[in-house]
Amino acid sequence: MKKLFKTISIILLTLFVSGLLILFFSPTPELLSDVNFSKAVYDDQHQLLRMTLSKDEKFRLYTPLSKISKELVEATLLQEDQYFYSHYGVNPIALGKALWQTYGVKTRRVGASTISMQLARIRFGINSRQVSGKLWQILRAIQIEMHYSKKQILEAYLNLAPYGGNIEGVGAASLVYFNKSVDRISLPEALTLSIIPQNPGKRTPQNHNLKHIRNHLFARWLVKHPEDGNKKVMFDLPLVMHTLKDLPFKVPHFTQQVLHDASITKQSIDTSLDSRTQIIVERITKHYLARKKMVGVFNAAVLLVDTRDLSVKAQMGSADFFNKQISGQINGIETKRSPGSTLKPFIYGLALDQGLIHPNTVLKDVPHSFNGYNPENFDYEFMGPIKAKDALVLSRNI
């Protein structure tokens, strides 16, 4: 039996060393460069207007490590890998303990995956529940440590870790669950996010034990940061989290224009749109349409621009983006259509410049026929003799 165990051990060690040598001379593995990310559009106060799905249907927003809450980074390491900066991809003590409890005494399955090992599993789709998969995961973790700094590894993990459903990475998770950028979250929110990747399927906003699990981590946090003891009152408050159905989808025509702008390549896009002004514009437009509904006006488009720098402050492409009866998804601002009465001031101005009329010139607002074409006014009526200035103000066509 001992001889068999020794033989198996030698074979496994040989395979492990061979695999390590192969990976050492293999090309550098990609961490984030070939990953497709979501895009997020913000207003002028950096409030989220819309976040898109990535090409593989994930909410995954790239966030550099420098833009991630330091408390979240530290809490994640406390929860997932306390010795992250001390090992080279594998924690041999934790791994040995896990192997003994899982396969030796067989009490319960214990995890011992480091941040690097978890990143390897996520990045390369490794099934780590099998022994062969676990060995491959270890080899890949060591390979990652060979080629990348701890900072790069941590950044990649925090951008790819699972946070429930199709939410990946702290950038998207923070926006979905707390409607905040990940550099603006509080300590309770940071600790809440840090406990989700360990069991993303169960640690959801609907889980009533989530607060208890988070507060247990806070107790460990206080051992390292006793100065945060005065924040305990924050952890006694109800844990309020949003879900994907609460994710903003505001000013859709405007955000579509921004997202389709080929010159914008970054994932997080700050715009000039003023959300407070946008709300006012939408309210005024809806009230106007409610008054004009009886005369057949059901749709409108509005563009509000700051003339000083031509930045867009508010925009409505239609009265209701989701209303099929008015073709609401068509952006009226971009649609080519007749200029209508827009040209009238210019025509009157040209006539004034050429001396053809003056403001008190009397014009005839009566029926005319031009080679079979019979123009009408918007009210289908004629006013007879009318001064030029009044004809312009009243938008007469004849």
Can you annotate each of these PLM segments?
Residues 71-101, 154-161, 188-196, 302-307, ...:
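Short, functionally critical alpha-helical segments immediately adjacent to catalytic or ligand/cofactor-binding
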Residues 20, 107, 111-279, 283, ...:
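Non-catalytic, structured segments within soluble enzyme domains
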Residues 46, 76, 119, 153, ...:
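Residue-level preference for non-acidic, small/hydrophobic
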Residues 47-61, 172, 199, 261, ...:
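Short pre-catalytic segments that frame enzyme active sites
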